[in-house]
Amino acid sequence: MGYEKRSLGSFEGRKIYEILLSLGYDMKSAQRICDKHRVTDAEDQNLHKNSVAHGEIFLIDYKCEPRGLKPIFECDAFAVFDKPSGILSHPSGRNSPYNMYDEIWSLYGQDACVAHRLDLETSGILIVAKDKDAARELKECFEQRRVMKSYL
């Protein structure tokens, strides 16, 4: 897994967020992309949302490289994976190795997220929310301790 740099095209005199909106991103997504410094110019300089484009611009985007790990259970709202030891629950930066998000996003898209974390060395059950509503509900369940976690 990793991030890849792909061209969004060549633009002159337009603000970065306007370009992202014209390419189909909603305002919230465009802002998040800019806030995470994922838009650059040809010299790899980060472009902020109000920066004005002069030439080709690039998006640094997550590239999933799934290995075929499948959920052991799933329903409409969430999925359950048996996370092996030695795999990160989530990426830890742009040079992150294979992690559970390679599987999660390739199966459910980028709105899916882990409901809790397991350490790199820890194997066990990992609950994945398939969308933002499910993520909010699962987070609340963990916060209110309606979900029991145990370690062997």
Residue ranges: model-predicted function:
Residues M1-L152:
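RNA pseudouridine synthases
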